[in-house]
Amino acid sequence: MEKYVRLQKIGEGSFGKAILVKSTEDGRQYVIKEINISRMSSKEREESRREVAVLANMKHPNIVQYRESFEENGSLYIVMDYCEGGDLFKRINAQKGVLFQEDQILDWFVQICLALKHVHDRKILHRDIKSQNIFLTKDGTVQLGDFGIARVLNSTVELARTCIGTPYYLSPEICENKPYNNKSDIWALGCVLYELCTLKHAFEAGSMKNLVLKIISGSFPPVSLHYSYDLRSLVSQLFKRNPRDRPSVNSILEKGFIAKRIEKFLSPQLIAEEFCLKTFSKFGSQPIPAKRPASGQNSISVMPAQKITKPAAKYGIPLAYKKYGDKKLHEKKPLQKHKQAHQTPEKRVNTGEERRKISEEAARKRRLEFIEKEKKQKDQIISLMKAEQMKRQEKERLERINRAREQGWRNVLSAGGSGEVKAPFLGSGGTIAPSSFSSRGQYEHYHAIFDQMQQQRAEDNEAKWKREIYGRGLPERGILPGVRPGFPYGAAGHHHFPDADDIRKTLKRLKAVSKQANANRQKGQLAVERAKQVEEFLQRKREAMQNKARAEGHMVYLARLRQIRLQNFNERQQIKAKLRGEKKEANHSEGQEGSEEADMRRKKIESLKAHANARAAVLKEQLERKRKEAYEREKKVWEEHLVAKGVKSSDVSPPLGQHETGGSPSKQQMRSVISVTSALKEVGVDSSLTDTRETSEEMQKTNNAISSKREILRRLNENLKAQEDEKGKQNLSDTFEINVHEDAKEHEKEKSVSSDRKKWEAGGQLVIPLDELTLDTSFSTTERHTVGEVIKLGPNGSPRRAWGKSPTDSVLKILGEAELQLQTELLENTTIRSEISPEGEKYKPLITGEKKVQCISHEINPSAIVDSPVETKSPEFSEASPQMSLKLEGNLEEPDDLETEILQEPSGTNKDESLPCTITDVWISEEKETKETQSADRITIQENEVSEDGVSSTVDQLSDIHIEPGTNDSQHSKCDVDKSVQPEPFFHKVVHSEHLNLVPQVQSVQCSPEESFAFRSHSHLPPKNKNKNSLLIGLSTGLFDANNPKMLRTCSLPDLSKLFRTLMDVPTVGDVRQDNLEIDEIEDENIKEGPSDSEDIVFEETDTDLQELQASMEQLLREQPGEEYSEEEESVLKNSDVEPTANGTDVADEDDNPSSESALNEEWHSDNSDGEIASECECDSVFNHLEELRLHLEQEMGFEKFFEVYEKIKAIHEDEDENIEICSKIVQNILGNEHQHLYAKILHLVMADGAYQEDNDE
């Protein structure tokens, strides 16, 4: 190292450091590879020295030049030339995504291939070809370096088995741990070429496993079409998974677009040496006999003479060939001398005899031309021979590999074949001659044939030349035979011709000698090979014996270890058994106590269920009795109305469901009630849009129209009540018949009173039972008949909807002609469901509830719906069932459904939202006009308005009652009741601000926060609170219905949506007056205590009898246990698809009807806030609601405690690592029993604050 000065370390790999140094002798920079061999095993040291031997033999312009090597201080130093241009990897990265030009890529690739050819021709595998090991010199020449893991193959048949190389460049056979040879270098060459074309690795992955899978599959992104087809196809050939399918370096260089570039980088001498001398080294004397002894051959023959200067040093050419080559060399050198010697006398002759000179020059020109032609022909022959030879070599090599594989698998001992004998070839410098002989042995048969062919050609050429020369020599008598340019030997050459036979004999003798020598070599090789195989076999046998002895010792140790472990295990088991015995004794008594407690709990639950069922039955009987009484009263009123109209009550046929289902005697009495269609026809609304429009216009212009509409609604209510009585016995088919169209109802009416049908002339069509008809058939008739009519609720109580109608067909047209306000028109879609008159709903919902219970049981979950709690709350359930039936019928949001019985259903809420203000105003105006007829009249008016306005009043009632299931709905319903009592103008312009004012009113109307929360938590909420209840139940039981966006929003959180819905719902409720708040409060209480109170309130009959009935029903419902309601809710939840819950808020309808305003609002508003905040102040902002809640909590708990809990909840929610489930336990511990019930409110406040801080800037 004293000759070099270290400059810097430029790299470090697993095989050593690379240090840039400067030579003190010549001042040039070199790279020294420092390999620490002091820590290496002897084998590793040998490998390092092998690298030196390999590098010493590598002399090629495209291979990094080896200078010297030395060992010093336990390290091996290898001195190589320094490539200033850096490596190809850095050059690729410097492009920064800009692709190389194809010429540049091919120039580099050709140079890499030439270097690799030089390596492979010497039976060396590089095994670490990658862009980091390909270097660029100052002038742009590419050089292959880093032969640190190169392996000299003892023969081309031998396949290396070690898995070495950079992961990105590993070949599939290495990844699969299969044998590999030079074709693995070809794969790596393909990786480098791909990298040059795309600036990326062909195979990239995040883990070694995925990388190996990609390499084995052989799939890589295609090369850009920017490059030629030849280049792209070359890349795909290099990436063939099967090594045999990949081309060799030689075949790559034979490709036209590659071969034409070789001349740019190799001198003619090197080209001849790389592509010609390989054949010379194999065929020995073949090239020399091929050269003709003509004068024109001199230049060509001299070149081979120079190339063979040190053949043994490079290629290990057999000594016999070297001698033969030297002999020919001596023969040719004299030729040159003779030529020169004869040229000088030739000049003398020319000076003396100019004429001869002229003629001689002419003859020389002719001969030179002939020689050039002959040269060209010979070049062509040589190139053809080269191509044939390359093909033969490739074919033979593949055959050898196949043979070696077959032999190796057949016989392990002979796996190495002749390869192991050939190990000395370049493995160490001292055995060159034997190795060369061995390399030649495999080709001996072919070599002999080639030698014979070449010799034959040489003899033929000599004879040909003789004939030509003799024939040409005759006319040129003046020229001496020795002076002829065709004969470089001059006269001597002339004398040699008679000795041609001697030459042939010599050649034959040499050929025989070489054959004998080859045969002897083969025999010797076989003997040596056999000896080696035997020795190796014995060695392996000895090693196997040693391993066996070692294994026996291990087995003894393992057996002893197993015994010790088994003993320890048994001891541990015994100790555990003892401990377990003590624990069992202690736990046995506890287990008994636990089982006794479980039995007690089970018995208690059963007794509670039985009690609830009994109470449900009693309540049902009472409600039925009251419904019958109410029905009788309604029937009388209806008959009076008919008499006033000139129609006999006997002519009126009962509702459709009564004929089909029979029912109790009281229910059968109701059959005399006529259908809505017949009532409309009697009034003059002859199922035509024009009549309906006229009535709507008259309604707005005159009170007479209003009164007629109210009477129609009364009739409708009676029909609904009658239908509800029979609902208990009706099937799904009944429900569908009722909902399909009114023609079926008229058909049933025909049966009861055939005389009236004669007047109507529509009976014949209606005889067909609807359950046997397809939906399309029944629907088309429905469209014709129900366009402008008030749709009557069928016996099942499901709201009437015309499926085929678009909202614009009926309601919009009617509304457009009715000169209604825009606000009412907006709600058409939503209000469709609420057209059913509130009066009918009051009792009909009950009746329909029963029938719907049955229907629902058929349709949805018979068991869940038929539960006694459901029956007991038949009013509630009837409401729920109407909703269910509505949804069953298609959740139609069309205006035709405005009459539906959803007054208390969530659909009502939707309608309210869609008509927030107008509905209430209309409702109020109607209520103010007349109290007695109000419920019916108002309902009729509402129905008509609904058809015209899009749910004007009935929807208001329904929506008011249902808008805020626990709070706003009740308030609205109560307000509506009050309003119904106070007659007012039919329509009012309502401003949305009024809705905002309603919020505080509604909140004040609600029960105290604790009460509302208690109801919520127990899922005893009234039917109007169904939305809340369904959400709470869904959240607590994990029943998240994908059809309900509210649930989706609150899946993993408390149902925060209630806060926003309540706050935003209030404005949509409509204009509700303060004087109605009292009724709302009553209704809220009823709702909370019993699900069906709201129904009665919805119907809002001002008759004293009805009021008494209301009061009694409210009393009954207050006494109902919460369990019944929860059971009912559960049954309703089971039917979540229909979602017609008794609570009156039809969540499913809301969610199913996103097109309507109400549905959209319902998503946010349908759920009421807990009602914790009771303030009568009017709030214009959501923040006021939250601040009131905050103030209320601070006053009740104390600021410090409230702040502590608030911060605790907030911290737990903000910490992603915290389990939110733990939050409730921790917080409830802090709150204690006294304030434990406030946890939900604080949680809502935290969630709301977080939501507004993050998302809402308003």
Curated annotation (Swiss-Prot):
<feature type="modified residue" description="Phosphoserine">
    <location>
        <position position="798"/>
    </location>
</feature>
<dbReference type="GO" id="GO:0005654">
    <property type="term" value="C:nucleoplasm"/>
</dbReference>
<keyword id="KW-0132">Cell division</keyword>
<dbReference type="GO" id="GO:0005813">
    <property type="term" value="C:centrosome"/>
</dbReference>
<keyword id="KW-0597">Phosphoprotein</keyword>
<feature type="compositionally biased region" description="Basic and acidic residues">
    <location>
        <begin position="344"/>
        <end position="360"/>
    </location>
</feature>
<keyword id="KW-0498">Mitosis</keyword>
<dbReference type="GO" id="GO:0005737">
    <property type="term" value="C:cytoplasm"/>
</dbReference>
<keyword id="KW-0067">ATP-binding</keyword>
<keyword id="KW-0460">Magnesium</keyword>
<feature type="modified residue" description="Phosphoserine">
    <location>
        <position position="1052"/>
    </location>
</feature>
<dbReference type="GO" id="GO:0006468">
    <property type="term" value="P:protein phosphorylation"/>
</dbReference>
<dbReference type="InterPro" id="IPR008271">
    <property type="entry name" value="Ser/Thr_kinase_AS"/>
</dbReference>
<keyword id="KW-0829">Tyrosine-protein kinase</keyword>
<keyword id="KW-1186">Ciliopathy</keyword>
<feature type="active site" description="Proton acceptor">
    <location>
        <position position="128"/>
    </location>
</feature>
<dbReference type="GO" id="GO:0005929">
    <property type="term" value="C:cilium"/>
</dbReference>
<keyword id="KW-0723">Serine/threonine-protein kinase</keyword>
<feature type="modified residue" description="Phosphothreonine">
    <location>
        <position position="661"/>
    </location>
</feature>
<feature type="region of interest" description="Disordered">
    <location>
        <begin position="648"/>
        <end position="669"/>
    </location>
</feature>
<dbReference type="InterPro" id="IPR011009">
    <property type="entry name" value="Kinase-like_dom_sf"/>
</dbReference>
<dbReference type="GO" id="GO:0016301">
    <property type="term" value="F:kinase activity"/>
</dbReference>
<dbReference type="GO" id="GO:0004672">
    <property type="term" value="F:protein kinase activity"/>
</dbReference>
<dbReference type="GO" id="GO:0034451">
    <property type="term" value="C:centriolar satellite"/>
</dbReference>
<feature type="binding site">
    <location>
        <begin position="10"/>
        <end position="18"/>
    </location>
    <ligand>
        <name>ATP</name>
    </ligand>
</feature>
<keyword id="KW-0808">Transferase</keyword>
<dbReference type="InterPro" id="IPR051131">
    <property type="entry name" value="NEK_Ser/Thr_kinase_NIMA"/>
</dbReference>
<feature type="binding site">
    <location>
        <position position="33"/>
    </location>
    <ligand>
        <name>ATP</name>
    </ligand>
</feature>
<feature type="modified residue" description="Phosphothreonine">
    <location>
        <position position="156"/>
    </location>
</feature>
<feature type="modified residue" description="Phosphoserine">
    <location>
        <position position="438"/>
    </location>
</feature>
<dbReference type="GO" id="GO:0004674">
    <property type="term" value="F:protein serine/threonine kinase activity"/>
</dbReference>
<dbReference type="InterPro" id="IPR017441">
    <property type="entry name" value="Protein_kinase_ATP_BS"/>
</dbReference>
<feature type="modified residue" description="Phosphoserine">
    <location>
        <position position="834"/>
    </location>
</feature>
<feature type="modified residue" description="Phosphoserine">
    <location>
        <position position="1126"/>
    </location>
</feature>
<feature type="modified residue" description="Phosphoserine">
    <location>
        <position position="414"/>
    </location>
</feature>
<keyword id="KW-0479">Metal-binding</keyword>
<dbReference type="GO" id="GO:0046872">
    <property type="term" value="F:metal ion binding"/>
</dbReference>
<feature type="modified residue" description="Phosphoserine">
    <location>
        <position position="428"/>
    </location>
</feature>
<feature type="compositionally biased region" description="Basic and acidic residues">
    <location>
        <begin position="579"/>
        <end position="591"/>
    </location>
</feature>
<keyword id="KW-0547">Nucleotide-binding</keyword>
<feature type="region of interest" description="Disordered">
    <location>
        <begin position="578"/>
        <end position="600"/>
    </location>
</feature>
<dbReference type="GO" id="GO:0005524">
    <property type="term" value="F:ATP binding"/>
</dbReference>
